[in-house]
Design a protein with these regions (language model features):
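Active-site entrance/lid segments in N-terminal catalytic domains of soluble metabolic enzymes
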Residues: 1-179, 315
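Residue-level detector of alpha-helix initiation sites
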Residues: 26, 190-191
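Short, surface-exposed recognition loops or helix-turn segments adjacent to catalytic cores
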Residues: 133, 187-188
């Protein structure tokens, strides 16, 4: 049995159990389709899309691929501080049902996905603790993404305050694998085939890579952001509420450190974005990476500029090389 013939791959309907993580604001239909056409699972980070925008994006992906792809939404309740900040989740879910999305994933909780599953979608939830993974399995998901502390972007924690959960993937993944019977996909700091092989060795059936695809040709990542990623060492990120009001891992730029150093509590999610987005936009316009609020994981320095299909091909080859070097038989 080949290393990629895992329960996760079968559940997701893909050749390779590699997920392009759904990074809201950076994923495009072109990126999702290119990854899926290469045999992995492309995705749309759709949390901030209106129902009409979501429908258009799904149809754009379908114009480019017949392969499975994933749509991701945020499952947290509308925040009291800004009740109309997000598009209504129930309206977004209605689009997911109507468009018969092949794979549906969610973050920050457990929505009512019964209609989505009845429409034929494979359901994927995000966990940062064993307790969350068990709750997801009890709710009926088909697979669990185990998000380690190394991961870029918002922490997916939903059963405890995110600041209390700092479990790295090396510790989290095998515990989640032991705790649930559904396939587990490892996430957090995975950038190349070595990381994928490590995830498989921990018992995961696949790996989710986000930061690694931010520099794909098809990603909506601006030049200043791309340069910043390549220059960010492993210690060059931090988890903070300074970006949005909710814990997220981002690069330690001057703009980030200035806000952290000011010592003022961030505004509640998502009102803090009213503070950071104008600074970020100005940094992009000035082509100044030091002014960006760049969500990224601890493996950012390992990014590579390439078309998404080439990245998938390289990841597969690297995984096979890593497994071969260890003399490991994944079917054993």
């Amino acid at each position: 049995m080949a290393w990629y013939e895992t329960p996760a791959a079968r559940a997701l309907g893909v050749r390779y159990p590699l997920l392009q993580a759904p990074m809201s604001g950076f994923t495009t239909p072109e990126l999702a389709a290119a990854v899926s056409n290469a045999g992995a699972l492309g995705s749309l980070g759709a949390a901030w899309l209106s129902p009409d925008e979501l429908r258009a994006a799904i149809r754009a992906v379908r114009q480019l691929t017949d392969a499975p792809f994933m749509v991701n939404l945020f499952a947290w309740p509308q925040p009291d501080a800004a009740p109309d900040a997000h598009p209504a989740l129930d309206e977004q879910l209605a689009v997911v049902v109507e468009e018969r999305v092949p794979v549906f994933s969610f973050t920050f909780g457990i929505p009512d996905f019964a209609e989505v599953k009845s429409a034929g979608a494979t359901i994927v939830g995000t966990a940062t603790t064993v307790a969350e993974a068990r709750a997801l399995e009890a709710a009926g998901v088909d697979a669990v993404v185990a998000q380690g502390w190394e991961a870029g972007g918002h922490r997916g924690t939903f059963e405890r305050p995110p600041a209390e959960v700092e479990v790295g993937g090396l510790a989290l993944v095998p515990q989640v694998v032991d705790a649930v019977s559904v396939p587990v996909v490892a996430a957090g700091g995975i950038m190349d085939g070595r990381g994928i092989a490590a995830a498989l060795a921990l018992g995961a059936g696949g790996a989710s890579l986000g930061t690694a695809f931010l520099t794909a040709s098809e990603a909506a990542t601006q030049p200043a952001f791309r340069r910043l990623l390549a220059q960010t060492p492993a210690e060059g990120t931090r988890v903070s509420r300074v970006y949005s009001g909710r814990e997220a891992r981002l690069v330690r730029t001057d703009a980030v450190e200035e806000l952290v150093g000011a010592g003022r509590p961030p505004a509640p999610y998502p009102l803090q974005l009213d503070v950071t987005r104008p600074i970020h936009r100005a940094g992009l316009q000035a082509d100044d990476p030091s002014r960006l609020f760049a969500l990224a994981g601890q493996g950012a320095a390992l990014v590579r500029e390439a078309p998404a299909a080439d990245l998938v091909e390289t990841l597969v080859a690297e995984t096979e090389k890593a497994i071969s070097r260890l003399g490991w038989d994944p079917s054993g």
